[in-house]
Amino acid sequence: MKFITQINEIKNKVSGEILFNESLSKYSWFNLGGLAKVIFKPKNLNELSIFLKNIQEENKVKVLGAGSNTLIRDGGFDGVIIKFGKTFSHVSLLKENILISGASALDKKVSNFALNNALTGFEFLSCIPGTIGGAIKMNSGCYGEDISKILISVQVMDLSGNIKVIPSSQIKFHYRGSDLDDDLIFLSATFAGKT
């Protein structure tokens, strides 16, 4: 009950949607999964930070991307699921060969954006379901390419609501993973393409 009271207090500080006992099956490509105690859909970075700063540390927090590579147990999730919306799915050019993408942008969207802007190196993303956040989390790849080869940096938020940027040179990538802390929430990333 204390948890629900705490979430209701946070509701007064944010305008993003907060759902209680929501079925996770509608967020999974497999249409499986039990209930999440809470799903929070922040409207922006500030709301996400406020939410995390006001939630107690003992509560479990996980981000759910596209749900394309996620199997959710029937018992659900006894904690908070963060679900990003369109605000976190932007894709744009920073420079001629530097692309920035929100963590919830679909991999295919990023690949298509690169193609439309005459950037190479992103082709492999076109056949990977999921989001850029998930791609970084698991070092997605195929056909001899992976996300670590094009990543410049990733912007993250810790569970205390603090933001930092981690250069790819400080990340140890391996096959379908990295040494990034599991508690980090990916917000956006910059990538280098070839013109």
Residue ranges of predicted features:
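Generic detection of intrinsically disordered/low-complexity segments and helix-coil linkers/edges
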Residues: L24, P167-S169
